[in-house]
A protein has these predicted regions:
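Conserved alpha-helical substructure of the radical SAM core
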Residues: 1-112
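A short, mixed-charge helix-start or loop-turn motif at secondary-structure junctions
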Residues: 26, 46-49, 126-130, 155
């Protein structure tokens, strides 16, 4: 929403990233979120709900258009915070790109964006998910998923971020959601801060290898439901994952995206 104070201000120029072409990019449309998930990298670094300068809708849309045209961006990932707090902006912005993706916690409903992807974060069966994301969140997300029109053309994925805390629930999670009106399920692994020790991360990546094997087993059992590929999952094994990321993320493919 544009306030009266900013309505007549000139639009700011988009950041100059040079002449490099980027096929994909991501944008955090807000740092604000209605949840406080224990594994969230935003909450680890800061309080995202603290008032800060916010780019108004008109400026953000103008900058997204400029960056798209300048860098040849075809795919845009909309993140937060919780991006659906700025639903009007996101629904308008996603149509600027050939391929759009929204990552949401699902508590504001599932947006209808035919031809685009909506990834809904859900971190295990109800008790394990709610221990991470907050009491009642699992049921809110379930209600949102079942309230949507499954024939509207929106690609809807559930994504479980696997931690040491919720790893015991992988199989139960898949069995619980396998008949939901979704396109599929994806798995990612929690990325700890440097030298982090606690209940979420494995101190030794070799301890995580049995969990990777369990996810691969779910892929083999439900090949159409679980969208993570076996090849991608095998990259998570301790004897090869650092080859693809580097010790400090220097080899990460995300570096090829415009941030």
């Amino acid at each position: 929403m544009t306030s009266r104070a900013t309505a007549n201000l000139p639009l700011r120029e988009a950041t100059d990233f040079g002449d490099r072409q980027f096929g994909a990019a991501l944008v955090n449309v807000t740092n604000i979120c209605n949840l406080s998930c224990s594994h969230c990298f935003v909450f680890r670094a800061d309080n995202p709900n603290r008032p800060k300068d916010k780019m108004d809708d008109a400026t953000m849309l103008a900058q997204l258009r400029a960056l798209r045209d300048r860098h040849g961006i075809r795919s845009m990932l909309f993140m937060g915070g919780e991006p659906m707090i700025r639903k009007k902006l996101v629904l308008e912005a996603i149509e600027l790109f050939e391929n759009g993706s929204i990552v949401t916690n699902g508590t504001y409903g599932i947006p209808s964006v035919p031809g685009h992807l909506v990834t809904v974060s859900l971190d295990g069966p109800e008790p394990l998910n709610d221990a991470i994301r907050g009491q009642g969140v699992f049921q809110k997300v379930r209600e949102s998923v079942f309230a949507r029109d499954p024939g509207d053309g929106t690609i809807v994925m559930l994504q479980m971020t696997i931690t040491k805390q919720n790893a015991p629930g992988i199989e139960e999670f898949v069995e619980t959601v396998k008949d939901w009106p979704i396109t599929g399920v994806a798995f990612t692994f929690y990325v700890p801060s440097h030298d982090e020790h606690g209940t979420l991360a494995w101190d030794d990546l070799r301890e995580r290898d049995p969990v990777v094997r369990r996810v691969i087993a779910m892929k083999e059992k439900y090949p159409r439901l679980v969208k993570s590929t076996v090849g991608a999952l095998e990259m998570m094994f301790s004897d090869r994952c650092l080859q693809f990321t580097g010790e400090h993320g220097e080899n990460c493919l995300m570096r090829n995206m415009l941030p």
